[in-house]
UniProtKB/Swiss-Prot annotation:
Subunit structure: Tetramer of two alpha and two beta chains.
Keyword list, A-Z: Amino-acid biosynthesis, Aromatic amino acid biosynthesis, Lyase, Pyridoxal phosphate, Tryptophan biosynthesis
Organism domain of life: Bacteria
HAMAP family: Trp_synth_beta (MF_00133)
GO MF terms, alphabetically ordered: tryptophan synthase activity
Residue positions where N6-(pyridoxal phosphate)lysine is found in the record: K99
Listed EC numbers: 4.2.1.20
Family the UniProt entry places it in: Belongs to the TrpB family.
Organism taxonomic ancestry: Bacteria, Pseudomonadati, Pseudomonadota, Alphaproteobacteria, Hyphomicrobiales
Gene it is expressed from: trpB
One Gene Ontology cellular component annotation held by this UniProt entry: cytoplasm
Protein name: Tryptophan synthase beta chain
């Protein structure tokens, strides 16, 4: 019997228990369960409250700068040959990535719940910057947990968070990356339940977070549908997005899931290759387990201990994935592939030189997959990729690898 039966619509999940097939759910400490249930109740109310939607739409337009443009990459298309390549330019949002879409939605929920303190975890620092930004905008204190390794390799974003008034707390346990930062944030939350709102940055964690984050990020895919119809008169043949925790990808994919003609490719961090442990390709090389409140694909050993992975990209350096992606993989609706560090670096440089756009290392992974696929497709076919972050934060990492002293 299939544990993940094919539904009438790929867009109907999660169920009332927060499950996508066998994935998702709500695995949290007893102390947190009342708060999680309060959050779910507030989220259910907010979803049907016209004033909530109106305030979020206003902020998206006048604060974030939405809609973000749909851009035809003419020179890159000519360089690669084959399919026409479009970018959804979410790196042009206020704060430089898609993360602000989610943070604005969640800060409005925190306000509705009367919370007076914001905590967040961050890897690349983009979610940390977006969290610090919305906390400043609404006058709330913000503490950001960040792995010590990431503090070092994402120095520009650490400075931005501090400028915005947030306290950045480095986490040195484990490998000092995103998983460890999330562990510390959860510990803080358990200790300070009453006044604290935990602003999770990706489409993972206990229900209702995966659903909430997806809904706030779906503005990407909804805009893309309208813009693509206006530009080409039809939907794209293929969507491509990077997946770390998976929020930018699910935001692009979800509004297209019931369109059979649209193929979808999620691109994981292949790191230094899948042979050893120096990668973060949990869907390609992992197995189902429970981490950070939800059941999903994880990088784990035979005893169920979580492995410390690797990626050149701090935002993809996470040993799990949002549960909806796990479900979409198992039912075969979305294809997930790994891209190695070296391939992402090559893509980073190609886009910079052909289009004058410096991408973050996260979407550079998606671009590397586009570079493989576009030449094999017809000139009448269309690829739409989510350019989910800009590369200012990565210039020190890339400069060091390329031998360009900064």
């Amino acid at each position: 019997m299939n544990q993940n039966p094919i539904p009438n619509s790929f867009r109907s999940g999660p169920d009332e228990d927060g499950r996508f097939g066998i994935f998702g759910g709500r695995f949290v400490a007893e102390t947190l369960m009342p708060l999680i249930l309060d959050l779910q109740a507030e989220w259910e109310n907010a979803k049907t409250d016209p004033s909530f939607k109106a305030e979020l739409d206003h902020l998206n337009t006048h604060y974030t700068g939405r809609p973000s443009p749909l851009y035809f990459a003419e020179r890159l298309t000519a360089e690669l040959g084959g399919a026409k390549i479009y970018f959804k330019r979410d790196e042009l949002n206020h704060t430089g990535s898609h993360k602000i879409n989610n943070c604005l939605g969640q800060i409005l929920l925190a306000k509705r719940m009367g919370k007076t303190r914001i905590i967040a975890e961050t890897g690349a620092g983009q979610h940390g910057v977006a969290s610090a930004t919305v906390a400043a905008r609404f006058g709330l204190p913000c503490i950001v947990y960040m792995g010590a390794t990431d503090v070092e390799r994402q120095a520009p974003n650490v400075f931005r968070m501090k400028l915005l008034g947030a306290e950045v707390r480095p986490v040195s346990s484990g490998h000092g990356t995103l998983k460890d930062a999330m562990n510390e944030a959860l510990r803080d939350w358990v200790t300070n339940v009453d006044e604290t709102y935990y602003m999770i940055g990706t489409a993972a964690g206990p229900h209702p977070y995966p659903e909430m984050v997806r809904e706030f990020q779906s503005v990407i895919g909804k805009e893309s549908r309208e813009q693509m119809m206006a530009a080409e008169g039809r939907l794209p043949d293929m969507l491509v997005a990077a997946v770390g925790g998976g929020s930018n990808a699910i935001g692009l994919f979800h509004p297209f899931l019931d369109d059979e003609s649209v193929r979808m490719i999620g691109v994981e961090a292949g790191g230094k290759g899948l042979d050893g442990n120096e990668h973060c390709a949990s869907l390609t090389a992992g197995s189902p387990g429970v981490l950070h409140g939800n059941r999903t694909y994880l990088l784990q050993d035979s005893d169920g201990q979580i492995k410390d992975g690797h990626s050149i990209s701090a935002g993809l350096d996470y040993p799990g994935i949002g549960p909806e992606h796990s479900w979409l993989k198992d039912i075969g609706r979305v294809e997930y592939v790994p891209i190695m560090d070296t391939e992402a670096l090559e893509a980073f440089q190609l886009l910079t030189r052909t289009e004058g756009i410096i991408p973050a290392l996260e979407p550079s992974h998606a671009l590397a997959e586009v570079m493989k696929r576009a030449p094999k497709m017809g000139k009448d076919e269309i690829i739409l990729m989510n350019l989910c972050g800009r590369g200012d934060k990565d210039i020190f990492t890339v400069g060091k690898i390329l031998g360009m002293g900064l």
